[in-house]
């Protein structure tokens, strides 16, 4: 008799598992059966599919009602939407009490707490699941949660970010063909990039992880968060064309999410205003501009003009003053430029602080300064010297708009000399990255 009952339970669980797998497949592969034009309907369609699945599950369950696996699968079905479900929390909490070693129930419960905004409880669930069994889902989720845990100090947050990268790498090692693991590793590297002074090697690792996610998992390309996060990195690296493309794609994939569209518009607005200011040299009148340029003095070079400049290699070097129009793309070692500020431009995101620099009758160059405190800035008429300037040439085309301009990237205001004076350490601050608190 027991054997027959066990067989029945097994059959019921198998059927329930199939129904839940189909529901999640519907969500993950939505854009394989729908066009991007249907993106606005996706959440509603998933919700309707969930209701349908729960109804079918109810018909199958029968007398197996209180079984831990049944509770887990029902909770998982309720957890398919991005919203917090109190019912899912209740069922999954019961499931882990009945069967504390049921790892999938712990993982699902952790996701429920995450959606509820209880990051500490989510962390406990994923860590607890790993004590029962090493599995990629707990590692993925732990990586995600570690970056959002509240901390009392910057050092503690840095440790969490490093740990987040470690957990994501472990998840990738467990299954190199899991796109979600690669995507979460990309996000961990993105946080590390902003947490450790924007090392270009780390941004490359983030971009490689995102590319790998798309390569191994066809559904990764329809993940709006992947496109937004990658675009954030591209924008910071001044790859504006790729950034606009990413924001635009994220907006198309999730029309109800305002951030990608806003970020695309903000960047377009910034580029439009910047190129207009560059063309008009900040609308400074010719006579005024000539007077400003006539006031440029070698003394304004400060430590960049007397052989005391310490290069990145740590050696003291004598810099050669060059006109802006003689700069080559990339870092111009051994050179220094000196010019007058003709405009400044801040964005809603405050980073970078952008200003226009002119040193002759030639064109105006944009200077983009990163990692500065919000109170730092330069004024129109200030003399600014930039040692070993890093020149970028921009050619951007997006939705019928064209932008072309030259810019100098400055990683910290500490590199600048303003009116002959080096900038103090109080002018520098670290950049941060914000992401929406939802399951990755």
Curated annotation (Swiss-Prot):
Site positions (Mediates interaction with N-terminal MREI motif of beta-tubulin nascent chain) are 147, 225, 259
Where is the motif Nuclear export signal annotated in this sequence? 13-24
Keyword Ribonucleoprotein carried by entry? no
Instruction: State whether keyword Iron-sulfur applies.
Output: no
What are the UniProt keywords, alphabetically? Answer: Cytoplasm, Cytoplasmic vesicle, DNA damage, DNA repair, Mitochondrion, Nucleus, Phosphoprotein, Repeat, TPR repeat
Q: Which GO terms describe its biological process?
A: cellular response to starvation; DNA damage response; DNA repair
A GO CC term attached to the entry:
cytoplasmic vesicle
The TPR repeats are found at 7-61, 68-98, 103-130, 136-174, 179-216, 224-253
Residues modified as Phosphoserine:
203, 221
Cite the SUPFAM superfamilies for this sequence. TPR-like
Localization of this protein: Nucleus; Cytoplasm; Cytoplasmic vesicle; Mitochondrion matrix
Q: Which SMART domains match?
A: TPR
Regarding how it is modified after translation, the entry says: Phosphorylation by ATM kinase induces nuclear accumulation while interfering with nuclear export, and phosphorylation by CHEK2 kinase enhances nuclear stability.
Main location per the UniProt record: nucleus
Residues of the region (Mediates interaction with 28S rRNA of ribosome-coding tubulin) are: 285-287
Swiss-Prot/TrEMBL domain comment: The tetratricopep-repeat (TPR) motifs may function as protein interaction domains.
Q: How does it assemble?
A: Interacts with JMY and p300/EP300; the interaction occurs in the nucleus and augments the association between JMY and p300/EP300 in response to DNA damage. Interacts with PRMT5; the interaction is DNA damage-dependent and promotes PRMT5 interaction with p53/TP53 and subsequent methylation. Forms a complex with HSF1 and p300/EP300; these interactions augment chromatin-bound HSF1 and p300/EP300 histone acetyltransferase activity, resulting in enhanced heat-shock-responsive transcription.
Its job: Cofactor involved in the regulation of various cellular mechanisms such as actin regulation, autophagy, chromatin regulation and DNA repair. In physiological conditions, interacts with cofactor JMY in the cytoplasm which prevents JMY's actin nucleation activity and ability to activate the Arp2/3 complex. Acts as a negative regulator of nutrient stress-induced autophagy by inhibiting JMY's interaction with MAP1LC3B, thereby preventing autophagosome formation. Involves in tubulin autoregulation by promoting its degradation in response to excess soluble tubulin.
The entry's protein name is Tetratricopeptide repeat protein 5
What lineage does UniProt assign to this protein's organism?
Eukaryota, Metazoa, Chordata, Craniata, Vertebrata
């Amino acid at each position: 008799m027991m054997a027959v009952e066990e067989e029945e339970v097994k059959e019921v669980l198998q059927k329930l598992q199939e129904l839940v797998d189909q529901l999640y497949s519907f969500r993950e592969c939505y854009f394989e059966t729908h066009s991007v034009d249907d993106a606005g309907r996706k959440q509603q369609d998933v919700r309707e599919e969930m209701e349908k699945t729960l109804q079918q599950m109810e018909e199958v369950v029968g007398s197996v009602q209180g079984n831990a696996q049944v509770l887990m699968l029902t909770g998982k079905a309720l957890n398919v939407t991005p919203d917090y479900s109190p019912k899912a929390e209740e069922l999954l909490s019961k499931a882990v009490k009945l069967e504390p070693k049921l790892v999938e129930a712990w993982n699902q419960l952790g996701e429920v707490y995450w959606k509820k905004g209880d990051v500490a409880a989510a962390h406990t669930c994923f860590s607890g699941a790993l004590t029962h069994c090493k599995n990629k889902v707990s590692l993925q989720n732990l990586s995600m949660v570690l970056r959002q845990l509240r901390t009392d100090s910057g050092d503690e947050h840095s440790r969490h970010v490093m740990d987040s990268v470690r957990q994501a790498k472990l998840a990738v090692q467990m299954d190199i063909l899991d796109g979600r693991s690669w995507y979460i590793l990309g996000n961990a590297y993105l946080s590390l990039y902003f947490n450790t002074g924007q090392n270009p090697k780390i941004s490359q690792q983030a971009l490689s992880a995102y590319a790998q996610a798309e390569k191994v998992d066809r559904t990764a390309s329809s993940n709006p968060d992947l496109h937004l996060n990658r675009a954030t990195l591209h924008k910071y690296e001044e790859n504006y064309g790729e950034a606009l493309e990413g924001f635009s794609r994220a907006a198309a994939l999730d029309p109800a999410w305002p951030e990608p569209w806003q970020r695309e518009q903000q960047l377009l607005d910034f580029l439009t205003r910047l190129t207009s200011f560059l063309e008009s040299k900040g609308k400074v009148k010719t006579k005024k501009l000539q007077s400003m340029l006539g006031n440029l003095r070698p003394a304004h070079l400060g430590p960049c003009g007397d052989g005391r400049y310490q290069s990145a290699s740590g050696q003291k070097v004598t810099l050669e003053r060059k006109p802006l129009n003689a700069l080559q793309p990339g870092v111009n070692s051994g050179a220094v430029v000196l010019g007058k500020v003709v405009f400044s431009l801040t964005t809603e995101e405050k980073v970078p602080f952008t200003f226009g620099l002119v040193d002759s009758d030639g064109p105006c160059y944009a200077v983009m300064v990163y990692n500065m405190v919000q109170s730092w800035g330069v004024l129109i008429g200030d003399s600014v010297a930039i040692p070993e300037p890093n020149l970028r040439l921009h050619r951007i085309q997006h939705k019928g708009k064209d932008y072309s301009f030259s810019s100098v990237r400055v990683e910290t205001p500490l590199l600048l000399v303003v009116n002959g004076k080096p900038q103090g350490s109080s002018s520098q601050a670290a950049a941060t990255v914000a992401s929406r608190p939802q399951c990755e």
